[in-house]
Amino acid sequence: MLVDAGMSVGFHTLDHPVLTQLPDAEVSRALTLGRGALAEAVGAGITLFAYPHGRVDSRVASHVPKAGYRAALRSGQRPVGPTSNLFLLGRWEPGPLGVRDLIAEAALRLNYPIGAP
C-alpha cells in the first residue's frame, strides 16, 4: 500500500545494533537478515538503508553497496548534491514536530505549496 502510493521503504536492521562496533561478518549479516521478509511484506525490493543510531564509518559504509542497496542514510540534516556519497546521506528526522509538521516545514523551505501538482 505505501509503495503503491509512491513511498519508499528502507531497511534499518532487525535488532538495531551499533554497526561500527560489530566485526565485518556481523555487519554483513545485519544488513541482510530480515530484509527479504520486509520486501515481501511491502511487495517491493528494498534498496534503501538507514544506519541504526545514525552511526556509520567508512568500513561499515563499504558493506552497504555490497549488500545490494542503492543508498543509505545517516543521522544529521546534510545538504545533498550531485557529488554526494549515496551511502552517507543525511536524513531529516521528525523529532518533536511529527511527520505532518516536517512535511509542511520542508514545503515552506522549498517554496513548494502543499498540494501542488
Show the residue positions of the predicted features:
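C-terminal active-site subregion of NodB/CE4 polysaccharide deacetylases
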Residues: M1-D4, S8, P17-P117
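A short, exposed helix-loop element centered on a Lys and neighboring polar residues
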Residues: H12
